[in-house]
């Protein structure tokens, strides 16, 4: 079973997703995309300040390195659509926008070891990002496995990215969410990721 630990003063929620059947983007997810878009138009999304405060607490300027939730929010505010990647990543992006909480997703068959750690990156640490050449995490909040960092609240790594081959994954909310949000996460993962969810 997945274990996620930290020695930092951060509140997070982690889930292990298993028996997944990730597919290409699904047409029947358009309702959730519309819900996220409507939340932005109506201003009913979560508190954008929570993720910014998390970054500032660890010395990162959130106006220069934006949390993923805010980057997605800004995309929608500019009239652009949410990126469609696959059935599981699409769920994470939609919930991240609505809740305004950064979400990390990691393929556990690609991660090394039985444990993920939320920590500060050391000087010079980084990884190849998804669609990015290099992501520097030195001095920044990151997620690491036994060989090094594989994600952070702004951008995950290509090494542990979710694909249609993913059968087991870690889902991390980098801020607390409500019990209703947890239930909704499990529901959407079951419907669109065709998988099961347990707390890590």
PLM ranges: what are they?
Residues 1-200:
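Charge-biased, low-complexity intrinsically disordered regions
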């Amino acid at each position: 079973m997945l274990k996620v630990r930290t020695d930092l003063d951060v509140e997070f929620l982690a889930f292990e997703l298993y028996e997944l059947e990730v597919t290409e983007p699904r047409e029947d997810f358009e309702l959730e995309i519309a819900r996220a878009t409507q939340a932005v138009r109506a201003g009913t999304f979560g508190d954008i300040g929570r993720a910014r405060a998390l970054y500032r607490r660890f010395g990162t300027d959130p106006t220069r390195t934006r949390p993923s939730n805010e980057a997605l929010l800004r995309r929608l505010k500019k009239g652009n659509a949410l990126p469609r990647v696959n059935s599981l990543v699409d769920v994470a992006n939609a919930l991240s926008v609505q809740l305004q909480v950064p979400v990390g997703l990691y393929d556990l068959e690609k991660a090394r070891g039985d444990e993920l750690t939320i920590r500060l990156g050391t000087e010079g640490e980084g990884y190849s990002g998804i669609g990015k050449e290099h992501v520097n995490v030195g001095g920044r909040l990151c997620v690491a496995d036994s060989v090094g960092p594989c994600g952070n609240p702004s951008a995950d790594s290509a090494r542990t990215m979710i694909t249609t081959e993913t059968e087991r994954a870690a889902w991390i909310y980098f801020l607390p969410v409500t019990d209703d949000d947890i239930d909704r996460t499990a529901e959407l993962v079951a419907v669109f990721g065709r998988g099961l969810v347990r707390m890590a």
